[in-house]
């Protein structure tokens, strides 16, 4: 599939998500390259169907994010007028054993707070920047999944990292300065 075909597929998926879940759907926006592509595409789909509607974005701040990511997030949210909700875990980071057990750490700092926020905000669906080529476990996933109480959509599932960067350059999208320093992914500092 060409990038143009992948983009068209992603837009069709987002239109389907909009039809099924409505404009209350939010983008799970990390400030990373992948979810920024999803954010921009969703913005276009939403603007076409609901001119003037605010783009909802949910950002997870674990308390361990790089300062550059937080600066980028806040700057772009202001510049683009996003309806940004920042979610934080209910964990005392001074006492928490960061990255001692990566699975527990991700559960406590990411999964639990994200699911709680989605429920509290009553979000019917969350669009993510998940790509199949990032992890073998993701390769067999469907683009739309039920998470019990809400759905998660991965509209750019078939995109490669090269596709994402090509789209960024062609569309002149901004990106976090850490990518210019050689980072390929912008997770929590202890795990990098």
What is each of the regions a protein language model found here?
Residues 1-192:
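Nucleotide-activated chemistry modules centered on ATP-dependent adenylation/adenylyltransferase
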